[in-house]
């Protein structure tokens, strides 16, 4: 301190030593006021002076009335004193307080600068200030001090500059290291080796290894020899960037430069190699250390032991432990924990426990980590008895059981189904004052979801909210996945929406799970729309996403849509997998596009490894199901030619196809031949096919034989086999034989299943055994089996067959109320029955129910309703049904429209009939000439000859060719009205239209002529008919005989008729007499008898 004040009152002190002694005495007794009366002079400061300055500062700041500026000045003076007295730590502390008190770095610098010359200080005070700022992470402030120092002609030391450089690099501040270096050189601050080390580290971190090598060369040329730190820095980055060859070359370069690698160098290299899963090379470096006489330490061995343990090579890790012990090195917790974890991962609990006890024998107390590793491994491998023992041991030894250990145990218990014990452990965890985290709760939720206890999982989610946590993305994904797995798709979507609202990031796993579930539920269009929405939200579908959607369309048989998605998939750059191709082929096969499927399979042979046994099996199975066995056998041969070996499924598919076609004997021979060649072994599925085929063929004894053969070969018949037998008995009408099969089903996967009951229900329903059907339905409910649409159909079928239609409707309503799916076939059956019984209103009510359930009308339903409505003269309702069919894209049969036109004409509503005719033409139900002809016939049938004739002429004028039936009907009306000549004129018109008479037309004209007594012309037509290749029927002969018998005079035609009747076998020669009239009467009786028998 350089204060020069003279006070006359203390002039008696003659020497400097006496003055110093007096000041010291006054200061030590805290009589600060006496200092104002003393005379000062310049002297070198020592440690004691710094201490006194601090003591004085503490006294001053406690004095009242001091202004901030005075305090700052005193603090700065004290800092200068401390720096000159080399008391750097107190100086740092004061500067830290001053920087916090003042805020701005420029203010602190200015305050120090103001007192700098007063105290004859030195620049190191600013070095300390810079380091204070760096230690507090205030890099910008340190750079500001560096700048201000330059303005006043001061330079910090190179060590301070290195500290700034190092801090800038670590912090990642937006400050250029190279700009700072340039400023250093500009201010002639000479860099040292440490400076170069920092710069080399920066270049290596950026991957600029060439520049770092150049800098090292520049460093050497400038007289700075790279140290071990320099080389270690470069080696570290070589290893981190995977340039291990360059690292080894640098090691050799170090040796050539006389810089020996130390144990830290090798430890760093080994650590980086192990982290990059190159543990074998790390072990070679250990051997290299030995050769270079560098002794590995505990860190070296721990790194390698941990690396080998993580890689599953615990035996090598154990050998390294023995080597470590042989060199006198002491393994620590890290060593044993790695070995315990390694042995546990391999499932070798005996060795893991040996390591644990060895650790204790070495005097090392197992830590929470040691126990945690052991407990986690034991729980994962379901060794819960051992785990419980070590858990209690931790408690006894006072080792704190932490959150990670508890979570590991809870996770292991949950994964192995010990959920209640997991909950108990959770409660113990809370009692120990350890709050479960989101990972702990996630393990519990996953465990409960896995076993289907979804309600409990949701309760745990509520508990998460109660403790102030929020479910993370993993928990949401777990809930969504398990909801989808259990078929609760609506709940899964609701959870997904909650996940979005919570702001969690959607991942591909959750996305693909939802897409797959939507496809499985048959909602493939919704799945595609969901994928579009995800794409618009920025989550692009991956290959799995596209595969899920293509598979969905494939399963539903929508091959074209599957290919559309495939095109989009390839367009965005995703490569199809063998699963993609399989789904596309499946889509074509299920959609019935077998020819296209065959072509697609052939094209896939050009794609490497795309065609395998599964692909061929897909197409072969589809061919078998479609009944195209020849093609299936051809595909089988093609497989063998292409060296694609058929598997058990291939043979089973072919055998099943043959059995379905009733070629069970061929299937058996094929199976025996394949078995003899060693291509396939007899299996349960194969014999089930034989049993099913034999029973369906009515060969129930042969079916029983194959059932017994299954037992002899050790293939226990399952419920599928028994169901095949029950179905066979039911089809043969021998359903009573199933009573012997039902008791033995108790041992087959829990007894009769829904398929069993449905088969029995259908069988008893066809027999109209309603009471047994209801007993079977009661058994379904009592056994906890959910009925399906087939159950409903079979039960309603029996009731309908028993003419209890009203009860059938009530049962249908009950099924719908219970949420059972009812199919279109059940509705069609009931609607047809309602229509047949004349209960049209009931039929319409059923149609309304169908519509409300989203089941559209089909052609069979509509046709049945139209027919009954027409019969009951409810023509307006009939038109409504026909219109509804058109709206739904169902093309009604033309005969339904024709029936409606006939009915309308019959009741005299000609105007509406013409409207319906126009609708037929407009909707393209049939060609215009057919529609117009139908109108002609309808008018003729209701006796409106003039209108019919007028319409016929209009048709001819419009160049529309009437049908033969319309001409025939009009000719029949003419003949009926006695206008045979007009009928014959119509025949001429027919001929002009290019139409020929058919058998009915000939019969109409012949009957009309006979009725008029014109037998000559009638027989002329008869001969013409025979010439056109038509064989006369009973109607023809009866008309001719009736005409002949009505004649009073003989006619030669009688002999012709009798001769033809005799030739055709209608009469015999034994029954003929000489009287033609009598013979004709006898022939008439014979013909009447024949027609009567035919009607019966």
Curated annotation (Swiss-Prot):
Keywords: Repeat
Residue stretches in coiled coil: none
Organism: Arabidopsis thaliana
PPR repeats: 122-156, 157-191, 192-226, 227-261, 262-296, 297-331, 332-366, 367-401, 402-436, 437-471, 472-506, 507-541, 542-576, 577-607, 612-646, 647-681, 683-717, 718-752, 753-787, 788-822, 823-857, 858-892, 893-927, 928-962, 963-997, 998-1032, 1033-1068
Pfam families assigned to the protein according to its UniProt record, in alphabetical order: PPR, PPR_1, PPR_2, PPR_long
Family: Belongs to the PPR family. P subfamily.
Identification of the protein by name: Pentatricopeptide repeat-containing protein At5g55840
Domain of life: Eukaryota
InterPro entries the UniProt entry points to: Pentatricopeptide_rpt, PPR-containing_protein, PROP1-like_PPR_dom, TPR-like_helical_dom_sf
């Amino acid at each position: 301190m350089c204060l020069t004040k003279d006070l006359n009152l203390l002039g008696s002190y003659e020497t400097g030593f006496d003055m110093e002694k007096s000041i010291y005495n006054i200061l030590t007794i805290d009589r600060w006021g006496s200092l104002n009366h003393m005379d000062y002079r310049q002297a070198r400061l020592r440690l004691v002076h710094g201490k006194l300055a601090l003591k004085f500062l503490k006294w001053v700041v406690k004095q009242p009335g001091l202004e901030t500026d005075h305090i700052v000045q005193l603090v700065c003076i004290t800092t200068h004193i401390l720096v000159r007295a080399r008391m750097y730590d107190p100086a740092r502390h004061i500067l830290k307080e001053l920087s916090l008190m003042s805020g701005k770095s420029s203010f602190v610098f200015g305050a120090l600068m103001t007192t700098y010359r007063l105290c004859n200080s030195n620049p190191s005070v600013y070095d300390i200030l810079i380091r204070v700022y760096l230690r507090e992470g205030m890099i910008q402030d340190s750079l500001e001090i560096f700048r201000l120092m330059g303005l006043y002609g001061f330079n910090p030391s190179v060590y301070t500059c290195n500290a700034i450089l190092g801090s800038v690099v670590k912090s990642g501040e937006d400050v250029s290291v190279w700009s700072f270096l340039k400023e250093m050189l500009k201010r002639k601050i000479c860099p040292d080796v440490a400076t170069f080390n920092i710069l080399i580290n920066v270049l290596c971190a950026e991957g600029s290894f060439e520049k770092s090598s150049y800098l090292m060369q520049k460093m050497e040329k400038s007289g700075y020899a790279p140290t071990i730190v320099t080389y270690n820095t470069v080696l570290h980055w070589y290893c981190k960037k995977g340039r291990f060859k360059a690292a080894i070359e640098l090691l050799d370069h170090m040796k050539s430069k006389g810089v020996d690698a130390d144990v830290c160098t090798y430890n760093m290299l080994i650590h980086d190699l192990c982290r990059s899963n190159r543990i074998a090379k790390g072990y070679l470096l250990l051997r290299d250390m030995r050769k270079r006489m560098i002794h590995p330490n505990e860190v070296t061995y721990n790194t390698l032991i941990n690396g080998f343990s993580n890689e599953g090579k615990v035996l090598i890790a154990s050998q390294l432990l023995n080597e470590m012990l042989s060199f006198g090195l002491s393994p620590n917790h890290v060593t044993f924990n790695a070995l315990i974890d390694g042995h546990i991962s391999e499932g070798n609990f005996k060795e893991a426990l040996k390591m644990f006890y060895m650790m204790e024998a070495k005097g090392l107390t197992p830590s929470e980590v040691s126990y945690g590793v052991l407990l986690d491994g034991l729980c994962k491998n379901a060794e819960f008895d051992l785990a419980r023992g070590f858990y209690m041991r931790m408690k006894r030894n006072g080792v704190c059981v932490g959150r990670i250990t508890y979570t590991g145990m809870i996770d292991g218990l949950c994964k192995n189904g010990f959920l209640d014990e997991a909950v108990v452990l959770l409660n113990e965890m809370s009692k120990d004052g350890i709050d479960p985290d989101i990972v702990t709760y996630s393990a519990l939720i996953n465990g409960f979801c896995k076993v289907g206890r979804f309600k409990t999982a949701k309760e745990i989610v509520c508990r998460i909210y109660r403790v102030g946590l929020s479910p993370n993305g993993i928990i949401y994904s777990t809930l969504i996945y398990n909801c989808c797995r259990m078929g609760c798709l609506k709940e899964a979507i609701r959870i997904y929406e909650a996940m979005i609202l919570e702001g969690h990031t959607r991942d591909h796993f959750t996305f693909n799970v939802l897409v797959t579930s939507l496809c499985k539920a048959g909602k493939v269009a919704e799945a595609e729309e969901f994928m579009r929405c995800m794409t618009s939200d920025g989550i692009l579908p991956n290959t799995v996403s596209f595969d899920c959607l293509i598979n969905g369309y494939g399963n539903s048989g929508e091959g074209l849509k599957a290919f559309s998605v495939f095109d989009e998939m390839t367009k965005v750059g995703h490569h199809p997998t063998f699963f993609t191709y399989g789904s596309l082929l499946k889509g074509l096969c299920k959609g019935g596009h077998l020819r296209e499927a065959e072509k697609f399979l052939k094209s896939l042979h050009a794609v490497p490894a795309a065609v395998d046994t599964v692909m061929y099996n897909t197409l072969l199975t589809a061919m078998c199901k479609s009944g195209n066995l020849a093609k299936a056998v051809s595909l089988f041969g093609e497989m063998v030619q292409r060296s694609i070996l058929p598997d058990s499924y291939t043979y089973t598919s072919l055998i099943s196809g043959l059995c379905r076609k009733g070629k069970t004997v061929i299937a058996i021979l094929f199976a025996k031949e394949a078995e003899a060649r060693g291509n396939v072994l007899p299996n349960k599925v194969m014999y089930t096919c034989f049993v099913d085929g034999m029973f369906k063929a009515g060969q129930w004894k042969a079916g029983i034989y194959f059932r017994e053969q299954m037992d002899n070969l050790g293939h226990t018949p399952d419920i599928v086999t028994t169901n095949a037998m029950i179905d066979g008995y039911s089809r043969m009408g021998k359903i009573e034989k199933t009573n012997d099969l039902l008791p033995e089903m108790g041992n087959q996967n829990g007894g009769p299943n829904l398929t069993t009951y449905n088969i029995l229900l259908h069988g008893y329903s066809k027999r109209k055994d309603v009471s047994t059907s209801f007993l079977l339905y009661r058994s379904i409910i009592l056994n906890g089996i959910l009925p399906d649409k087939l159950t409903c159909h079979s039960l309603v079928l029996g009731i309908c067959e028993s003419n209890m239609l009203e009860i059938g409707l009530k049962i249908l309503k009950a099924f719908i109320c219970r949420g059972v799916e009812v199919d279109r076939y059940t509705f069609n059956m009931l609607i047809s029955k309602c229509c047949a019984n004349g209960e049209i209103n009931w039929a319409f009510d059923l149609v309304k129910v169908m519509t409300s359930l989203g089941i559209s009308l089909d052609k069979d339903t509509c046709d049945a309703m139209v027919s009954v409505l027409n019969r009951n003269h409810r023509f307006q309702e009939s038109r409504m049904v026909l219109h509804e069919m058109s709206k739904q894209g169902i093309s009604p049969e033309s005969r339904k429209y024709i029936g409606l036109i006939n009915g309308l004409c019959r009741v005299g509503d000609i105007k509406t009939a013409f409207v319906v005719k126009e609708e037929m033409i407009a909707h393209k139900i049939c060609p215009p000439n057919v529609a117009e002809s139908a109108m002609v016939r309808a008018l003729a049938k209701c006796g409106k000859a003039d209108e019919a004739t007028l319409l016929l002429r209009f048709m001819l004028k419009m160049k529309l060719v009437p049908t033969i039936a319309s001409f025939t009907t009009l000719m029949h009306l003419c003949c009926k009205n006695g206008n045979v000549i007009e009928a014959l004129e119509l025949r001429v018109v027919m001929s002009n239209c290019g139409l020929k008479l058919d058998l009915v037309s000939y019969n109409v004209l012949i009957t009309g002529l006979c009725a008029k007594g014109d037998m000559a012309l009638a027989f002329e037509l008869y001969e013409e008919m025979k010439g056109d290749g038509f064989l006369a029927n009973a109607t023809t002969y009866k008309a001719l005989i009736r005409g002949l018998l009505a004649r009073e005079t003989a006619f030669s035609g009688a002999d012709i008729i009798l001769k033809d009747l005799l030739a055709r076998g209608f009469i015999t020669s034994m029954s003929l007499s000489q009287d033609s009239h009598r013979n004709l009467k006898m022939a008439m009786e014979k013909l009447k008898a024949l027609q009567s028998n035919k009607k019966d």
